[in-house]
Amino acid sequence: MRTLFVGDLHLSADRPDITQAFLEFLDTQLHDTDALYILGDLFEVWVGDDIAEPFVNQLVDAIKHASEKLPVYFIHGNRDFLIGEAFAKRCGMTLLPEVYSLDLYGVSTVILHGDSLCTLDKSYQRFRAFRNQGWAKWLYAHLPKSKRLGIAAKLRAKSQSSNQQKSYTIMDVEPDAVMDLLDATQTQQMIHGHTHRPDIHQLAHGKRRIVVGDWYEQGSMLSVSQDGVELIELPFGK
């Protein structure tokens, strides 16, 4: 048996190929699997459970079907932090806190989306702190739908523009932040996404950091079992 992790799919109506690949993943890859964890940014943008493009309904049905076979867990990303209990219930998913610790086949593990670890990106961290305020979420959720969609479009454009000007180092996780979280959670292993830089990093004191891949050019999943960990590429259309 194994546990699977995916993240950073950035599903949208503009990329039906990614949606189809994820549907195929749900249909073919969940055999001999104890649980599926989605580590955020399942969608390119999510402005509220009351707004969903038509393609989302097919995803809801597929995730719900998967959840009838095994537990499906979700941690919010920076693109879909407004996914709420209503949508999760439709999918049969369990929403997890921003940072979650678990035992994976005898290895103490902490999982998260990963954006909180990019502490050198000061401007983003300031925005993130504002965005996570309860009053800010409430205010945004009560704006007209057209207003929310407009704000989301402007934020995406601003993010793309600013990221082009930021260095590789600033946009990656900060090593001290990684070790601080491992120490705070008393865990040996960390699994996250966000950076789109899949890899398995061996750290000091026998600890390990694993980054799941994005789904822009191909699918990607992390398989964890009693035998170890494996990052697996999932080419589209195969």
From Swiss-Prot:
Membrane-spanning ranges: none
Needed co-factor(s): Mn(2+)
Main location: membrane
GO function term, MF aspect, one: manganese ion binding
Pathway(s): Glycolipid biosynthesis; lipid IV(A) biosynthesis; lipid IV(A) from (3R)-3-hydroxytetradecanoyl-[acyl-carrier-protein] and UDP-N-acetyl-alpha-D-glucosamine: step 4/6
EC assignment: 3.6.1.54
UniProt keyword terms in alphabetical order: Cell inner membrane, Cell membrane, Hydrolase, Lipid A biosynthesis, Lipid biosynthesis, Lipid metabolism, Manganese, Membrane, Metal-binding
GO biological process: lipid A biosynthetic process
UniProt catalytic activity: UDP-2-N,3-O-bis[(3R)-3-hydroxytetradecanoyl]-alpha-D-glucosamine + H2O = 2-N,3-O-bis[(3R)-3-hydroxytetradecanoyl]-alpha-D-glucosaminyl 1-phosphate + UMP + 2 H(+)
Residue numbers binding Mn(2+) 1: D8, H10, D41, H196
Protein's membrane topology: Peripheral membrane protein
Keyword Manganese: yes
CDD domains named in the record: MPP_YbbF-LpxH
Record's keyword annotation contains Transmembrane helix: no
GO (cellular component) term, any one: cytoplasm
Short name of any one Pfam family annotated for the protein: Metallophos
Top-rank taxon: Bacteria
Subcellular location: Cell inner membrane
Residues reported in the UniProt entry to bind substrate: N78, R79, D121, S159, N163, K166, H194
Role summary: Hydrolyzes the pyrophosphate bond of UDP-2,3-diacylglucosamine to yield 2,3-diacylglucosamine 1-phosphate (lipid X) and UMP by catalyzing the attack of water at the alpha-P atom. Involved in the biosynthesis of lipid A, a phosphorylated glycolipid that anchors the lipopolysaccharide to the outer membrane of the cell.
PANTHER family, sorted: UDP-2,3-DIACYLGLUCOSAMINE HYDROLASE, UDP-2,3-DIACYLGLUCOSAMINE HYDROLASE-RELATED
Stated family: Belongs to the LpxH family.
Identification of the protein by name: UDP-2,3-diacylglucosamine hydrolase
Taxonomic source organism: Shewanella pealeana (strain ATCC 700345 / ANG-SQ1)
Name of the gene: lpxH
